[in-house]
Each structure stands twice: as structure tokens, then as C-alpha cells.
Amino acid sequence: MVIDYNAIIVMEDLNKGFKRGRFKVERQVYQKFENMLISKLNYLVFKERKADENGGILRGYQLTYIPKSIKNVGKQCGCIFYVPAAYTSKIDPSTGFINIFDFKKYSGSGINAKVKDKKEFLMSMNSIRYINEGSEEYEKIGHRELFAFSFDYDNFKTYNVSSPVNEWTAYTYGERIKKLYKDGRWLRSEVLNLTENLIKLMEQYNIEYKDGHDIREDISHMDETRNADFICSLFEELKYTVQLRNSKSEAEDENYDRLVSPILNSSNGFYDSSDYMENENNTTHTMPKDADANGAYCIALKGLYEINKIKQNWSDDKKFKENELYINVTEWLDYIQNRRFE
């Protein structure tokens, strides 16, 4: 493909921490593959071609160089480009949405732990509404009745990531997987229907949600002790709403590795990797069919970003600086969230 399509190879830039920290066998397998690939492409020959033909034994393609040490290969080795793996699998490929809420702050020994903090979190939302039939938004989201959590990341404690797009509306679209643990071990999985769960919760507490009003109005009047169950249950449903990757254990279903986005995309749909799994033989569908495929797709997009950087900054008069190939998280999110590759 490199020869036929004038293509590049894009790989994860797995740092020294990965190579030191993984199991010895896994580390050795990866390094062996990396070395073999570089060596193979250093002088690529096609056996079926004549000796003096391009690609023949006397005129092989030199597509890489042999580094003194694989540790010092940098961001590029000929046609092989190395890009950081950050935010490539747990990301919505259609909108660039990532979940950067720092939910660890709200964890505790029980589901009703830190009720005050969870209430403050919910009140920091821009709005919490139920989208009912008859509203403009109902038409926009494909005639679905869903709950909508609108928020601005600037109003929350998040991981140390700067997102170019901070305002989002997360809908309770699709199912999520809740992992159940016992004694610190993954016991089994539970399938959550977010919308059904929230409807039951609202009805249990006699909240008139169907009129589409901002449910924060009800939360603001709630006593944290008497309504701890409601506050914490609503918080949990929100937490699973923004959970993109949903996997089951190998014992349950080793092939279940699904990405479901709560964000409405430009096609007025929601990205669900299972939609593309069912149509994987249909070449008109180009979106990733599972979380692993999404990682590969986004790694490729980062490679495209670097190629564009080279084109924009190349000059025959001066040496191209290696740090020009560095792509930080903010640049990457801007690239995918604002669809700068289209």
C-alpha cells in the first residue's frame, strides 16, 4: 500500500514508560515487530519484479533508515510516523467529544456518598431537561424522547485537558454497560437503559418532567439528607450517559466492545459503533465498528494532521524541525472537534 498509494504508516508513539511498564513478553513482542518493520522497509524488494526494475533486488525502495537505537527513533523514521495515543479510543469520531469530568472527586464508600458535592455538580449543569414529543429538539434528535444534560466544561473540575469546544449537550441515547465488582474484582456486567431508569426515578419522586422544564429547579429545593437517593441516582445516570466505551468481560461476550456517543452530530444522529459492525461489508460506511477500530481511525487522523503540518511548514531553505511534528491534546481536539480534515 505504501508504494501503490504513496502512503505513510502511522503508529502509536509508545513511550519508554510503556516499554518498561508492560509485561516482559508483551514489550519484547512490540519491540521485535517495530524493529522488523523498520528493517523490512529499509530496503523493500518485490520478488516478482525483475532485478533492475524499481522494487527489484538491485533497485529496492529505501523507505526507512536504521536508527542507532530504537529508543532514539523520534517522531519519524522515513515513511513511519509516530503519534501520541492520547484520546484516540475513548472519543466520539463524529463530534470529537471526550469525557473529561473528574468523577473521582465524587466517589465514596457507598452510592450516597458525598451528596452535597453531587448536588453542586448537578446544579452546575446549564440545564437538565426531558425532550418530549412536539418540541423542536424532539424533531432534531430523530423523534426520540430522551433526557438532555447541557453543560460547559469550564464550570467543572476536569482532567488537565484544554478542550476547544466546552459547551455540550449529552442525551440519554442508547445503552451503557455498568461493571459490577466484588472484592475489587470485576464480577459481571449490567446493561443500563438510561432513559427508562431516569423516567422511573422522576416518577418515584413525583417530578413532572414531561413538560420539559429544567429539573435543576426541583433539585435546588431538595434536602440533601431526605433526597440523597434521588440526587445520587441522577448523578450516576449522568456519569454513565457520558461513558463512551462499553465493554463486557471475555466470559460474558468477548466481542462486545461498543462505543456509544451521547452527543448529536452534524448528521442529526448519534455515533454508535454497533451500527457499523452490522454493515462492516458495506464500503459506503467509513466509521469505526468498535473501540479498537476507533483507536486506529484516530491514530490515522493524527497522521494526516502531521502530513498537513509538514506541507504547511516545509521550506527547501531550512531544515524541518522535529518538534513541528509534535501534536498536543488541544491541537488534536481542535482538529477533530472542528473537523479540520474535511
Give the residues covered by each predicted segment.
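Positively charged, helix-rich recognition surfaces that bind polyanionic ligands
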Residues: 1-342
